[in-house]
Amino acid sequence: MKKEGIEGTERFLSPGKGRGLKAIKHFKVGDLVFACPAYAYVLTVNERGGRCECCFTRKEGLSKCGKCKQAYYCNVECQRGDWPMHKLECSAMCAYGENWCPSETVRLVARIILKQKHQTERTPSERVLTLRELEAHLDKLDNEKNEMNDTDIAALHHFYSRHLDFPDNAALTELIAQVNCNGFTIEDEELSHLGSALFPDVALMNHSCSPNVIVTYKGTVAEVRAVQEINPEEEIFNSYIDLLYPTEDRIERLKDSYFFNCDCKECTSKSKDEAKMEIRQKLSIPPEEEEIKQMVIYARNVIEEFRRAKHYKTPSELLEICELSMEKMGAIFAETNVYMLHMMYQAMGVCLYMQDWDGAMKYGEKIIHPYSVHYPPYSLNVASMYLKLGRLYLGLEKRTQGVKALKKALAIMDIAHGKDHPYIDEIKKEMEEQT
């Protein structure tokens, strides 16, 4: 395939940012700017049996691979379509049994290596940026990241050496770094993790904390839609990170994961920081600066502690961490403070896992309004929270509230996902069943 570009857009040199993507025509809110099929992708292990490995369709009665009995497909066409990639893992899963445990990154890298062997021309995923052009930032990796890369290389050799010829370690290190810096997480309508993929053309877009496009997924295809008016010659910006947090946290996260300092209008104006860091009103003695600073340090530490604890603590222990941390932070922070909201969101997730629907609903009700204030318009985080709440209400037979919440989710998803997205049809069906 020859280099053909993406209609309505153009690759260019963005001042101070390097290469980027700009509009050469007008896009209105909700317009599809472009779609990009995955160069390579992998369904996460936890979704096996519920979704097709090839097209990610969620449905009952999928057929499983007769050999490994672990991969599931819609039909023979999907199974055949996935076989070149699945054969990398099929016999290995049979041989290793429960000891077959490569990380998702390793699985994705193995598929990329296989594709590179057979694919010599540009693919439809590389109309404006090829995989080989992706940034790796090897010179900026610290010891911890280098060690993780070495672990991934060892796992590649361990699990895939029978079916793959590997490039040398230097090339492998670069490829893994490219995937870590440019890979995408495919998520469903509730932002649950479905898999990992590489979309080179989507990776060309630079970051802004006030993005004018949003990326959603239709199966294994990424769709980029305008969430602000975009005029000709304006740069097209995506967001690489969760935008809930204050400027200092966002800058730190972008520096750590993507190796650049963000100077977007949101980071220079810090216009939302005061609301995001809301302090409790009506305290008899307002907290001093140092107290607030110490509480922020505590909040960041507890967020990291909880992230690690998810791997080994029980749900009730996790809920206790959430409740104790909210109690401590609540002495200074308002309930609308993003660190409080973070722990409420985690607590809601634990309640959902434990099937404590009332508990999940109570947290969701506290979260939804501040989310709508803190996030930019047409945020998937806000849409998914309305969806979760709507479905909780319906499950608890609060029909009116349920339908109202689902309608609010749909208003965002019509723009972010496009009116013809299968998720929208599913939600409309859920609403029709209530009439």
Curated annotation (Swiss-Prot):
Q: Where does S-adenosyl-L-methionine bind?
A: K17, G18, R19, H137, N206, H207, Y258, F259, F260
The record's Gene Ontology cellular component field reads:
cytoplasm; cytosol; nucleus
- Any idea which UniProt keywords this protein has? Chromatin regulator, Cytoplasm, Metal-binding, Methyltransferase, Nucleus, S-adenosyl-L-methionine, Transcription, Transcription regulation, Transferase, Zinc, Zinc-finger
Pfam families in the record, alphabetically? SET, zf-MYND
Give the ZnF (MYND-type) ranges.
52-90
In this chain, Zn(2+) 1 is annotated as bound at: C52, C55, C74, C78
Cell compartment(s), UniProt: Cytoplasm, Cytosol; Nucleus
Where are the disulfide bridges? none
SET domain: which residues? 7-241
Known role: Protein-lysine N-methyltransferase that methylates both histones and non-histone proteins, including p53/TP53 and RB1. Specifically trimethylates histone H3 'Lys-4' (H3K4me3) in vivo. The activity requires interaction with HSP90alpha. Shows even higher methyltransferase activity on p53/TP53. Monomethylates 'Lys-370' of p53/TP53, leading to decreased DNA-binding activity and subsequent transcriptional regulation activity of p53/TP53. Monomethylates RB1 at 'Lys-860'.
What family is this? Belongs to the class V-like SAM-binding methyltransferase superfamily.
Supply the name of the protein.
N-lysine methyltransferase SMYD2-A
Q: Which species is this record about?
A: Danio rerio (Zebrafish)
